[in-house]
Amino acid sequence: MKLCGFDVGLDRPFFLIAGPCVIESEQLQMDVAGRLKETTAALGIPFIFKSSFDKANRSSGTSFRGPGREKGLEILAKIRRELNVPVLTDVHTEDDITEAAKVVDVLQTPAFLCRQTDFIRAVAQSGKPVNIKKGQFLAPHDMKNVIDKARAAAREKGLPEDSFMACERGASFGYNNLVSDMRGLAIMRETGAPVVFDATHSVQLPGGQGTSSGGQREMVPVLARAAVAVGVAGLFMETHPDPCNALSDGPNAVPLKHMKALLETLVALDSVTKRNGFLENDFGA
């Protein structure tokens, strides 16, 4: 798959989707995007900046949702233009899809909406690459149906069918908890789409703080290393310079000051994993 000018797949180094969970201010986004661009360039990691203009699924109705679509897209457009980095944002409605597709390079669908057929069809027909998140309630093999829906919708419009990624972000495990079954990353390869691992939402404790979600950010490196050892096309990680005071998903965000060290480890591990190949492909023979 070709994504934002670079090739992605299990025969290529992983690419990174990263940035703050939500757009808090223009300056914060510019600072984080600039820092991430510098770090990833030094490590040879293809990079896509992400942030949300509207967090439409916050735990509480009083939680900060973002600057809104118009202002948020203006900020993302500025980052794209001035820093020359591709940008990704998530969409929640068909109106979001139409407007965001005019600005960003990649669209992302929320995990909660992966079974909404009309929504998946609409985003697939946007003409943009799409990172489709697996629902916390969905078995890994069921993502094939989701990807197939997207491909069929793209095909109807004469659009490329290889524009979709399948993203793992953990599975519900009782109340207020998620687990990551690493077998799922291998199973999701059966979709034929590049597999992305969301290492930060996978350590979220949904609704675990009453009116907001908790998280275990110290477990992000653990799961990220595991995913890279399994073999993935890309990684998704939210990061913030001050996670304890972030306006959304701070408990599971990577402190920006630690991103370089974490990525250095992951690059080394990714190289070993992909150099030696995937023996599991031969075990059924």
UniProtKB/Swiss-Prot annotation:
It comes from the Bacteria. It comes from Paracidovorax citrulli (strain AAC00-1) (Acidovorax citrulli). Its main location: cytoplasm. Its EC number is 2.5.1.55. Belongs to the KdsA family. Keywords: Cytoplasm, Lipopolysaccharide biosynthesis, Transferase. Pathway: Carbohydrate biosynthesis; 3-deoxy-D-manno-octulosonate biosynthesis; 3-deoxy-D-manno-octulosonate from D-ribulose 5-phosphate: step 2/3; Bacterial outer membrane biogenesis; lipopolysaccharide biosynthesis. Signal peptide: none annotated. The keyword Nucleus does not apply. Coiled coil: none annotated. PANTHER family: PHOSPHO-2-DEHYDRO-3-DEOXYHEPTONATE ALDOLASE. GO terms for biological process: keto-3-deoxy-D-manno-octulosonic acid biosynthetic process. One of its GO terms (cellular component) is cytoplasm. Gene3D superfamilies: Aldolase class I. GO terms for molecular function: 3-deoxy-8-phosphooctulonate synthase activity. It catalyses: D-arabinose 5-phosphate + phosphoenolpyruvate + H2O = 3-deoxy-alpha-D-manno-2-octulosonate-8-phosphate + phosphate. It is found in: Cytoplasm. HAMAP family: KDO8P_synth. This is 2-dehydro-3-deoxyphosphooctonate aldolase. The lineage of its organism: Bacteria, Pseudomonadati, Pseudomonadota, Betaproteobacteria, Burkholderiales.
